[in-house]
Amino acid sequence: MKKLILFASGNGSNAERIVTYFRENQLAEVALILTNNPKAGVIERAERLDVPCMLFDRKDFYDTSYILELLEREQPDLIVLAGFLWKCPENIIARFPNKIVNIHPSLLPKYGGKGMYGMHVHEAVIAAGEQESGITIHYINEHYDEGAIIYQERVVITPGDTPEHLAEKVHELEYRAFPLIIKQLLQS
């Protein structure tokens, strides 16, 4: 069975969908969820789903090789950033080339980069008068949201859409597409 490790900073709704999806199809298991946020909803979700969850801080991630060594011991087939807000250190990217994927709530390269996450993205998209938005699943590199694009899917922005309504549309895409694309990557 293939092994996934997830990183998440927030609510964990995408992480939960991934765990549930792979429990049903048994191609892979989520061996561990890592979070940098002691108040993240993903902690409660991991507990409820009986998936090991570990909290780490900036020192563990950037100043020591603690997280890198943990990942090397676990030997995941894929590392999935599911709402993880920190930039991944270059030593981890170098050790796991084309094995770290992220999901972003816009059609990159638009509305990507530092500070562009969650509702910030949807507010910027609506403020700019865009007619469509969507999701991008991509490999990560040393720059925010600039890695090779694996998959994109669009949603139409209709007159009167608010950032909150756009967020709902984008979440629906994320929940459906992210596990399927992860599955395809594991099978390739």
Ranges and model annotations:
Residues M1-S188:
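One-carbon transfer enzymes
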